[in-house]
Amino acid sequence: MQTIKCQVLSLAFLFSTYAVAGDDLPSEAVLLLDESIKGNLHSETKSGKEAADEMRLSAVKVEAYTWGIQEGAYFRNNEIQSLLNKNSFVLNKTVTLSKFLIDGQMLMPTVLEAERVYVQNGASEARSINMSYTLDKSPKIVSQAPTWRDYLVRTMPKPRKPIRNAYPKNSVESAAWKIEFERGWFKGVEQANKIYQSDLNKMHKDVTGLYRFRFLLAQNIVTIPRLGRDKSSVMILDSGKTIYLNDVKYTIQLDSQFNKVTEWKPVFNRGSAHER
């Protein structure tokens, strides 16, 4: 115990001798400072210069690759947006969600469909499901029906060029710059394509889910959500500083749910309610 106590006291003494802000610099630090001011530390050895060149080359590569990614993604996104605008007439006709509005103010819920689901509940129990439906997105109040633009239109800010010192300064750096910029460019194009595909998949999922809900609604398999209106001819707010005339407040009073099987009403149609 006495030995441990001595060790602790020694450590305490050691840490107590550490310099803190406000103390004088030790002689070693003063010497380094003086030599740096006089310029006596600039005589680099060959190995030191090579190390500095390697560090700069690595920085040049990173800068070129990063800039290439940004420029590639920006270029490809502009291409995609241009193609979408050129085909806007067809898209406006193809992707129409106004038919999924209830009372012109509420967007229908979406329904997910899964086939041949197998669920293993431990070693002694399992379940095989031929078909399942799940209410996914709840109904929501909207000012207008969403369009394809809400899903697919994306803007990217124009990338900023690298700072002057980041550009290559010799043939070795120029060669590395070219390779890394091209590699980054195509990586950026790939990223822009993935972003667009993700947006497209999201739109397809939502539109398909809306059609599926309407198909189930036609058979009374699901209930229709209810939109409530609370109308006030005059409403005074902010201690009399604001007045609303003909104010209408919309609220979703009842969400959708699946009906009992006994309430289902099979409908024979030509597929108009279950369009894909």
Where are these regions (language model features)?
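Bacterial N-terminal signal peptides that target proteins for export
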Residues: 1-9
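N-terminal signal peptide c-region/cleavage motif recognized by signal peptidases
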Residues: 16-18
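N-terminal Sec/ER secretory leader and immediately downstream segment
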Residues: 22-151
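Mature extracytoplasmic/lumenal regions of exported proteins
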Residues: 104-276
